[in-house]
A protein has these predicted regions:
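Carbohydrate-binding/catalytic loop surfaces
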Residues: 1, 44-65, 105-124, 161-174
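Loop-centered beta-sheet repeat module
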Residues: 120-174
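Well-ordered mid-protein domain cores that form the structural environment of catalytic cofactors
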Residues: 24, 29-78
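Structural helix-adjacent loops and short alpha-helical linkers that scaffold large soluble proteins
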Residues: 15-29, 76-90, 133-146
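Long, well-ordered core segments of solenoidal/helical folds
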Residues: 27-44, 88-105, 145-163
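Single conserved hydrophobic/aromatic residue that forms the stacking wall/gate
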Residues: 1-10
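Internal, well-ordered domain-core segments that constitute the primary functional module
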Residues: 60-107, 114-118, 125
Length: 174
């Protein structure tokens, strides 16, 4: 099985931050091509796992695959100078927001009998927005970043425990 998007993020970040190694850039482009050809379902959501040949194995209820793909596309745009990948990352980010805001698209983690929420999506949105903002030089992503930080502070940060809690009740209660 292959988790392409996450692997690709590391290759691009290595190229952008460690060494301008053309082999890394070529590997990143190959991975992006694979992601685009094999990792999206017809509903616009991504598979979580596919085989090396691109056969889908598993699709999850959350948007982490989409998040890593958007980060990968942003990093590739920065590394290669090809802004079409920044636009693709932006489009994917907007699709992620639609998935999160539209009831029924993403299955809830818990049934209503266990009302709680986690910080994982909130935190990954900071990273995704930051990377796309860097790729397209668009300060409008500050709103998403600020909203995510505000939600972390309001609901998940608990100074009484000297901790940022991973899961809390619907209103941030422990």
């Amino acid at each position: 099985a292959l988790s392409s998007a996450a692997s690709d993020v590391y290759k691009r970040q290595a190229y952008n931050n460690i060494e301008k190694n053309e082999a890394w850039l070529a590997a990143a482009k190959s991975t992006i091509d694979f992601i685009e050809a094999h990792c999206f379902d017809s509903d616009g959501r991504m598979y979580f796992e596919v085989t090396a040949e691109g056969t889908p194995l598993r699709k999850r209820r959350y948007i982490f695959s989409e998040s890593f793909a958007a980060i990968a596309m942003s990093e590739y745009a920065i590394a290669s100078g090809d802004q079409t990948y920044a636009v693709k990352a932006l489009d994917l980010f907007k699709r992620m927001q639609y998935f999160m805001e539209t009831p029924g698209i993403l299955a809830p983690k818990y049934l209503d009998t266990l009302p709680m929420k986690g910080h994982s999506i909130t935190m990954i949105l900071i990273n995704v927005a930051s990377r796309i903002r860097q790729a397209i030089q668009d300060e409008s992503f500050n709103g998403q970043i600020d909203a995510s930080i505000d939600q972390l502070r309001k609901d998940f940060m608990h100074p009484e425990f000297k901790a940022l809690l991973e899961t809390v009740g619907p209103n941030g209660e422990f």
